[in-house]
Amino acid sequence: MDSRVYIIKFDNWGFMVNLMNKIQILRKISQTLFFVRALIVTGFYLSIVGFIKRFIIGDRILATIITKIIAIVLAFIAGRVFCGWMCPFGFLFNLVYELRVKLFKLKKLPTVDEKIHNKLIYFKYVVLILVVLAYLSGVKISGYTLAYLLLALFLVLGFIYPMFFCRYVCPVGSLLSIFARFSIFKLKLDENKCVGCRLCERKCPMQIKITEKIDQMECIRCFECMSVCKKGALSFSAFTKNTKKE
């Protein structure tokens, strides 16, 4: 008997489609609720600069402290769940790229040149360091005008390239990705079931080369890849490794 522990594993395509559809609906509901909550908490002044400042540097608001603790604990257990299910800005960037997909009827998500992408994903760590250094040196990080201009810019970039801000700029994502590297539950590929169609990669908003190596630090646990895999080759599990081709 297979003693490995699986949380999500599919052998029946019909069952898989049904379950993944429900998971995607649940994710949309979660994103929407957390977005509405963020609007209420901030008095409808949703600032991308303020969000970064509060999350990275911190404040004394209990709700922020609890959210940060939950996000970090979740990252250590299951990866960047906060990014894919709870982040209010992730919700907005998700909306704009899905809007482009529907408007232009895209079957494959737009991608950044691979060489550029592989370098740009480290830029968010530079932003994280700069935010911390700015705080330590007493530089004030504020200004709603700047915040909304940046949000508008990243919404446009997110319309062109899915989750641009989340991939390359967000210091919150870079902080959580450090914990996600050691997450207990991981997205895994069974190479014996994979037929190399790369449907999963075409649907991945983070441009992860799933069939080559799943980067757990970049994965936001949106499970779009699992939703389109017709062979059930992907699983989200603990205490197992990728299954190599026999």
From Swiss-Prot:
The protein's name in its UniProt record: Uncharacterized protein MJ0749
| Residues that coordinate or bind [4Fe-4S] cluster 1 | C194, C197, C200, C229
Originating organism? Methanocaldococcus jannaschii (strain ATCC 43067 / DSM 2661 / JAL-1 / JCM 10045 / NBRC 100440) (Methanococcus jannaschii)
User: Gene Ontology terms, cellular component aspect?
Assistant: plasma membrane
Membrane-traversing stretches = 32-52, 69-89, 121-141, 146-166
Residues covered by the 4Fe-4S ferredoxin-type domain: 185-213, 210-239
Annotated [4Fe-4S] cluster 2 binding lies at C204, C219, C222, C225
Record lineage? Archaea, Methanobacteriati, Methanobacteriota, Methanomada group, Methanococci
User: Domain of life of the organism in this record?
Assistant: Archaea
Which PROSITE patterns does the entry link to?
4FE4S_FER_1 (PS00198), 4FE4S_FER_2 (PS51379)
What is a single molecular function from GO for this protein? Answer: oxidoreductase activity
Membrane topology per the record?
A: Multi-pass membrane protein
